Amino acid sequence: MNAPVGARGTEFAVVVERGKIQEFAAAMQSTDPAYRGPAAVVPPTFLASSALWAPEGARVDVGFDRKRLLHGEQEYVFHGPPPRAGQVLTACDRIEDRYEKPGKRGGTMRFAVVVTEYRAEDGTLVAEGRSTLIETAPRAGGAG
């Protein structure tokens, strides 16, 4: 199924846990004190891990063949200070754009831009993650 531009996933909670922030910072080999302590802030790419917390079926389905799926680009925009430990955000995906381009080895590559909005408990938009997904062209002869 190819969900249209504007299609949305189901909202899910993102609990910003201090320990998870510290684990993420350690994985980045960061010693920045902003990522430690009770009021730790999230590193800029921390929200990527929220995809792992989404319940099954909550993420918007762009309908691409996972055997030919590439993650082309990722961008984060913060609308104010970064989230802090103890916050509970509500996340929801939406398809912002779809387009096609000819593949360099033939066939057509399909693209989908998915924006994940992260909102504070009062509904304020805190951050957005913008991801460009690419479905490569099928190989000649129909093999994935």
Regions found by a protein language model. Give the residues of each.
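HotDog/MaoC-like acyl-thioester-processing domains
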Residues: 73, 78-144
